[in-house]
């Protein structure tokens, strides 16, 4: 039960894409033994419109349904078969029947409902069209389907994003009892500590294996780092001494052989790489002028699109208040934010905004595929800044030069979130509206 950890942009999702064959490695090869079944939850998977949740979940057992169809086809053909053919068909049907019973085919619907309820899909309704679901609910459908496949190895990329607390608890128990292997990417430390017994740490394109949970890894990593730094310093001192000796003695006849000997020693030395400082992001928001006392006044507000999502609500938001909005997925938290910001109209009721308001809105996800580089994306929004200033702002959010010059749509979820945070930080703001800002962010970025 492996936890794959590392800062945003180190290549965790890329690693999973390489081992699943979605990307080609630059060198080397990936081999899976023939009978190993692999289940992959990718951050960016999509669902087909027109299917219900139940129909999507049943596709987890596609192979079994195909076997059942093969058996039914054989029954249809039996009426026209010769005695010899009939014998063969009966044998094949018996084998299929036995395989289906052994695999629990006849209790699949109960199994589907058990896992769907565990992740909170029961309350959504399994007969709903997947195109009607919120982003969080779609993620739950994909995760449920994956868990139902009972693969020999699960590859899970941030499975707790969009899960409510009770469903994270259910998933924790499920993974603790999972009889097969899994590789898990997660920035939720409590969750990681509960389910993994091995950590693979990805840093500077190197994978290092640690046994134990995330806390144990942190202890071991701190020791390893200090040993690396000490070894690097010792070697640098030795190199300096050798170079000094060579420079002073290579020209003198009496000592030239000793100088050559030292040069050979220096040439053979395996150089220790200087430990790289981890880039830590800093998030600071520019404050605009002070707004009026009341930021938002909502009266008899009903949220929704075509149909109401809520009963009428009345509330005030005052300057200086720090408010958290909680509730299960699909209840309308994002809709509430968009309604009070004036991005979508309420079904009924009214919203009044205060004076001198300059909101900064962080959306959960970008809707369109962003073809711009991170540099272009920020610069287009702030054309008055110099190239250096835009690069400095992005670097301050923990992005490297490689990220800054990459197209936004190829960045990992965490890197893309940092680009959006960067744009917010360059704006004068007196009211922050943040929709799941820490989804995809690594541990350091979350803390900061």
Which functions belong to the PLM regions below?
Residues 220-275:
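Intracellular alpha-helical coupling/juxtamembrane segments of multi-pass membrane proteins
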Residues 283-285:
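Post-kinase regulatory C-tail/linker adjacent to protein kinase catalytic domains
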Residues 1-230, 279, 288-448:
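ABC ATP-binding cassette signature C-motif
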């Amino acid at each position: 039960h492996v936890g794959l950890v590392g800062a945003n942009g180190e290549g965790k999702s890329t690693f999973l894409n390489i081992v699943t064959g979605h990307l080609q490695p630059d060198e080397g090869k990936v081999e899976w033994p023939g009978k190993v079944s692999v289940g992959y939850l990718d951050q960016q998977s999509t669902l087909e419109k027109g299917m219900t949740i139940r129909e999507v979940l049943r596709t987890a057992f596609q192979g079994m349904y195909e076997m059942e169809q093969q058996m039914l086809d054989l029954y249809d053909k039996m009426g026209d078969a010769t005695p010899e053919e009939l014998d063969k068909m009966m044998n094949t049907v018996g084998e299929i029947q036995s395989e289906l019973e052994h695999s629990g085919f006849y209790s699949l619907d109960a199994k589907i409902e058990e896992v769907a309820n565990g992740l909170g899909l029961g309350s959504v309704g399994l007969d709903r069209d997947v195109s009607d679901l919120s982003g969080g609910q779609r993620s739950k459908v994909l995760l449920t389907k994956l868990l139902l496949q009972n693969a020999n190895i699960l590859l899970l990329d941030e499975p707790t994003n969009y899960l409510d607390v009770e469903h994270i608890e259910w998933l924790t128990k499920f993974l603790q009892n999972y009889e097969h292997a899994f590789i898990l990417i997660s920035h939720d430390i409590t969750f990681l500590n509960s389910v993994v017994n091995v950590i693979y740490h990805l840093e500077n394109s190197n994978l290092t294996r640690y046994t134990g949970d995330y806390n144990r890894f942190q202890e071991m990593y701190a020791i390893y780092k200090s040993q690396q730094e000490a070894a690097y310093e010792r070697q640098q001192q030795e190199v300096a001494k050798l170079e000094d000796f060579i420079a002073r003695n290579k020209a003198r006849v009496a000592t030239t052989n000793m100088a050559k000997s030292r040069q050979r020693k220096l040439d053979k030395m395996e150089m220790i790489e200087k430990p790289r400082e981890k880039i830590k992001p800093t998030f600071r928001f520019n404050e605009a002028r002070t707004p009026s006392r009341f930021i938002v006044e909502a009266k008899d507000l009903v949220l929704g699109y075509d149909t109401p999502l809520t009963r009428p609500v009345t509330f005030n938001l005052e300057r200086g208040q720090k408010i958290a909005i909680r509730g299960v997925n699909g209840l309308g938290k994002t809709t509430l934010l968009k309604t009070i910001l004036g991005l979508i109209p309420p079904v009924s009721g009214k919203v009044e905004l205060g004076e001198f308001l300059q909101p900064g809105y962080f959306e959960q996800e970008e809707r369109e595929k962003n073809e711009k580089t991170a540099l272009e994306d920020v610069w287009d929004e702030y054309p008055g800044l110099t190239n250096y200033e835009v690069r400095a702002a992005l670097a301050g959010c923990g992005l490297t030069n490689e990220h800054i010059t990459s197209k936004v749509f190829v960045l990992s979820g965490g890197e893309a979130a940092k680009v959006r945070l960067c744009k917010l930080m360059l704006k004068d703001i007196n009211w922050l509206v943040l929709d799941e800002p820490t989804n995809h962010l690594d541990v350091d970025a979350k803390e900061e």
